[in-house]
């Protein structure tokens, strides 16, 4: 086991604070509408330019191991805030730095660290309740666009795109961000349910110009089995032909004689049919077939529940207004399933999301909810260069997370104003002893830090602006972009409540642990002794060269 280097008390805390300050100072230059960029060197390819706090934090590793421990703990604050709300990483870092700095001063002055932590925790718990009371629901497109704009560093086009995407696919819809091909940002919306399975035979194509199969008002047969014998399907095919409507078959597979017969019937115009494989594998395939059945008002024909394909009737088939199939995807538009059944299915999947243990499972379940409840929108980010593309894409993803958080828990006044108001409301909070009261004051002082940093990044005097904002009430604050005072919500400067709450809670959590640190342990650096054997060999070879 390697020897350890151990530091105690003030020596440990000073080193830790130095690491905290290096990381926080690098991150906090990005805060606010006039925050600066940070350039990150990469071992290959062009450097990355970013204004995303967590991206900067993740790049920082310090040579001194004790300082690095401090930096890594604050990095954890940024990562946790990012995981919880997708934004607010810089705010969380600024709050953590302030609590740690003021807290360690109090420890050096002889306060009890545990009581300080209890005071900080008490203030934060009270502040969170006040934040919830200040929160305003965020439901209209204008507010969603404003939240997106602020989170994307005052880029209005991004805010509008996200609001438009949410408008099209609903609050539950899936919105993804991809690299675009042009200079302009674009929004692609897929209505209805789309899954990644294309037609089983190109002979089903009835729109040669687009290479797609389009079926108007089709019946939809859902079978959880392989279909290879056409006899099983004859009763259904005859019933569909009599009804004079097309048929879409979604099954585990359609092969051999069955597929050949369907193709022949389609080409002769006897009945219009298309077949696709069911999406997913194993249990997930069964679940997705059931989703499609709910959406289209049909029944999954499965031998597990005693249903046979030969006995299927038109009542067992689902229906939709339109189906479009190309070689890779199938889209079902306007299924006729009942709204109550769809909502029931969505509620059931939501329950599974809460119980899911892996991120992958959770993501797949959320996709299923979106396909049932809304649709899928893709924001394609346009830029002139790859460096700009990466930077812009990161901003759009941040803005998307922020708007989701806003829809979930509402919004508060932005620009650090909400925390100032909360601090003034709990200014009379008292702990059980004087040390806890100091902890409460440390937390209240930290709540001013985001506003002060935003103002500092604009080149103004933080104390003057902070005192002016404190003198106002409600949503009165400082618009750093225009350097004007006014009602922040009216000016469209909003922060999601969840983002502000998460930033404060995670900052206080990690900072409280750091204040109570009394000892730090790390590995001693290994001494790299030169390999004398190798050096001697080289010398000998040199001598031989001289003789020749």
Swiss-Prot record:
GO terms for biological process: protein refolding. Pfam families: Cpn60_TCP1 (PF00118). GO terms for cellular component: cytoplasm. It catalyses: ATP + H2O + a folded polypeptide = ADP + phosphate + an unfolded polypeptide. Its EC number is 5.6.1.7. CDD domains: GroEL (cd03344). It is found in: Cytoplasm. Keywords: ATP-binding, Chaperone, Cytoplasm, Isomerase, Nucleotide-binding. It comes from the Bacteria. ATP binds at residues 30-33, 51, 87-91, 415, 479-481, 495. SUPFAM superfamilies: GroEL apical domain-like (SSF52029), GroEL equatorial domain-like (SSF48592), GroEL-intermediate domain like (SSF54849). PROSITE patterns: CHAPERONINS_CPN60 (PS00296). InterPro entries: Chaperonin_Cpn60_CS, Cpn60/GroEL, Cpn60/GroEL/TCP-1, GroEL-like_apical_dom_sf, GROEL-like_equatorial_sf, TCP-1-like_intermed_sf. The keyword ATP-binding applies. The keyword Chloroplast does not apply. GO terms for molecular function: ATP binding; ATP-dependent protein folding chaperone; isomerase activity; unfolded protein binding. It is an enzyme of class 5 (isomerase). Together with its co-chaperonin GroES, plays an essential role in assisting protein folding. The GroEL-GroES system forms a nano-cage that allows encapsulation of the non-native substrate proteins and provides a physical environment optimized to promote and accelerate protein folding. Forms a cylinder of 14 subunits composed of two heptameric rings stacked back-to-back. Interacts with the co-chaperonin GroES. PANTHER family: 60 KDA HEAT SHOCK PROTEIN, MITOCHONDRIAL (PTHR45633). Belongs to the chaperonin (HSP60) family. This is Chaperonin GroEL.
